């Protein structure tokens, strides 16, 4: 009935307040709001507390993950620095080893060259000695051939007999 009177007064062109407590259901509304406040506040409080706990747990979890990520990043950076230092050391060791190997190879090469030179000089000396010996033999043969030819032309049989007898006497075979 309150709505009808409201519409009736609104149709008459005025606005007025209805102060009849029973007609406006203020008591019913107060009871419902009170019940909702008493029981709803506990329910909503529990929901809000649960939500708050979940948010706090999520924040703590996020902070823990961020802390772990930071620790992992720090460890990875340290590992990277160590790896870079080790790589630099390996590079330096490789340079030293390469230089040592180079010097060893050069030394071996010089030794081989010296051996080859010595071998060549020795072979040359040997060949030179062979050639000199061959020349001496050839000169001796030519000289003997010339002496024989001259002896045949200059010596007759009596001179040859005297020469043979004298040679035998010199050798100690003469009586």
Curated annotation (Swiss-Prot):
The record's keywords, sorted A to Z, are:
ATP synthesis, CF(0), Hydrogen ion transport, Ion transport, Membrane, Thylakoid, Transmembrane, Transmembrane helix, Transport
Places the protein is found: Cellular thylakoid membrane
Keyword presence, tRNA processing: no
Transmembrane feature ranges: 26-48
Membrane topology according to the record: Single-pass membrane protein
Q: Say which domain of life the source belongs to.
A: Bacteria
GO CC entries: plasma membrane-derived thylakoid membrane; proton-transporting ATP synthase complex
| UniProt GO molecular function | proton-transporting ATP synthase activity, rotational mechanism
Briefly, what is this protein's role? F(1)F(0) ATP synthase produces ATP from ADP in the presence of a proton or sodium gradient. F-type ATPases consist of two structural domains, F(1) containing the extramembraneous catalytic core and F(0) containing the membrane proton channel, linked together by a central stalk and a peripheral stalk. During catalysis, ATP synthesis in the catalytic domain of F(1) is coupled via a rotary mechanism of the central stalk subunits to proton translocation.
Instruction: State the NCBIfam families in the record.
Output: ATP_synt_b (TIGR01144), PRK07352.1 (NF005606)
Family per record: Belongs to the ATPase B chain family.
**Quaternary context:** F-type ATPases have 2 components, F(1) - the catalytic core - and F(0) - the membrane proton channel. F(1) has five subunits: alpha(3), beta(3), gamma(1), delta(1), epsilon(1). F(0) has four main subunits: a(1), b(1), b'(1) and c(10-14). The alpha and beta chains form an alternating ring which encloses part of the gamma chain. F(1) is attached to F(0) by a central stalk formed by the gamma and epsilon chains, while a peripheral stalk is formed by the delta, b and b' chains.
The record's listing under HAMAP family reads: ATP_synth_b_bprime
Q: Give the protein name, as stated in the record.
A: ATP synthase subunit b 1
């Amino acid at each position: 009935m309150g709505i009808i009177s409201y519409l009736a007064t609104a149709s008459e062109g005025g606005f007025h307040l209805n102060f009849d407590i029973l007609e406006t259901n203020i008591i019913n509304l107060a009871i419902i709001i009170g019940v909702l406040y008493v029981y709803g506040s506990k329910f909503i409080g529990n929901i809000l507390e649960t939500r708050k706990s979940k948010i706090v747990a999520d924040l703590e979890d996020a902070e823990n993950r961020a802390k772990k990520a930071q620790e992992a990043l720090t460890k990875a950076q340290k590992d990277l620095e160590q790896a870079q230092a080790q790589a630099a050391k390996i590079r330096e060791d490789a340079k030293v080893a390469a230089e040592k190997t180079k010097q060893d190879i050069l030394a071996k090469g010089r030794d081989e060259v010296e051996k080859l030179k010595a071998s060549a000089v020795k072979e040359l000396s040997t060949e030179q000695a062979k050639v000199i010996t061959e020349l001496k033999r050839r000169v001796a043969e030519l000289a003997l051939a010339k002496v024989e030819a001259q002896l045949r032309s200059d010596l007759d049989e009596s001179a040859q007999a005297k020469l043979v007898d004298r040679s035998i006497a010199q050798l100690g075979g003469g009586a």
